[in-house]
């Protein structure tokens, strides 16, 4: 195996959108392949037809591309080892099912689901771990054939089970976990390799595919550890060498310490959800790669090229990776600060249009206004959809201050500062950020009020917010009419509150 070319695979099931955990598996396999100048194979494992979602494969492929992951072979681009959808490989699987049946390493099982469940219930009652019990124990070959013929005559459809040898230890040196071993009597008995509908089970099909596609390394989540001894059983039955395995730790919710579950609605878990919020693909790539893998040094922001250069599976963590939403927001903010402004404009415009704040085809002048709005908030946003809430003041009619804002203004010498600032603004012909800041400085000179006592009342009176972007830029975008209306309303409200 050491001399073989590196070939890895990412093999999702088309059961829905691309999950954070699956995206991490894809990223680690991608980085491992690119670091070693190897091959990444995309394979669609769609044998569980009951769980398949229409368009699921296409959705996952699109989101993988969005993240910046490409592959060398797959259902969309072909390759020498196809087909790359398991549903198109049934004849291939049947060949090896037949081989194991002919060699006596597998057999037809006619036990019904009801009989199997009754068997499991009985075992639980006895305090025994549920497992399959060989149904032909003590029978001759002729007796087995007769029993199977009678079952077929009754219209029963069989599954195919593989024999689990007794007293065998299945072991491997895991890239992440180290040496692991399972005794054959802990697997649960002879397991199904072909279902009643003729489709192979996961643990059988994956072995056939990995062997025929010459996969050298299998990097996947550690929820697959219990599958590995079953797969090693199939490898041994067919006389094949197994690939190198590496099982990555689970991802946990940093807020709860529990495994990141699709049922946990406190965390967004699908790549498509982050796309809709306006997260950047480079930031998602960066953040997800650091979920369970540690680069050299203290830096947390890396380019794809740097990740490829550094990636070493030996640095995969043995402890669960914590998914921290605030950390993701911070990482995305770092990327937004240096992102192409046209890219941010496109994302934010989509968010504003979706919220009904900007029309579908804005005129050039309106587009320039939106561009200034986006540039103003770019460093403040964790993702572009935040612009909808941050910029509401620019899309609403002049309104009264909130009680909280009134209380804040009462702390300072608000009225004289606001009255003088209104006079200074009234003199302006060109309502630009530079001129507005000049008006604030003139207010300072005329009133002697300075620092927070000057800036906070003016900010609250004009923008209806105690925090925000540069006050001059914000007022320029609001326009003189709106700002003056806000100042008039503020002075009226202060009078009503008895603040002179």
Curated annotation (Swiss-Prot):
The keyword Hydrolase does not apply. One of its GO terms (cellular component) is cytosol. Its EC number is 6.1.1.17. A motif ('HIGH' region) lies at residues 12-22. Pfam families: Anticodon_2, tRNA-synt_1c. It catalyses: tRNA(Glu) + L-glutamate + ATP = L-glutamyl-tRNA(Glu) + AMP + diphosphate. ATP binds at residue 262. Belongs to the class-I aminoacyl-tRNA synthetase family. Glutamate--tRNA ligase type 1 subfamily. Catalyzes the attachment of glutamate to tRNA(Glu) in a two-step reaction: glutamate is first activated by ATP to form Glu-AMP and then transferred to the acceptor end of tRNA(Glu). Monomer. This is Glutamate--tRNA ligase.
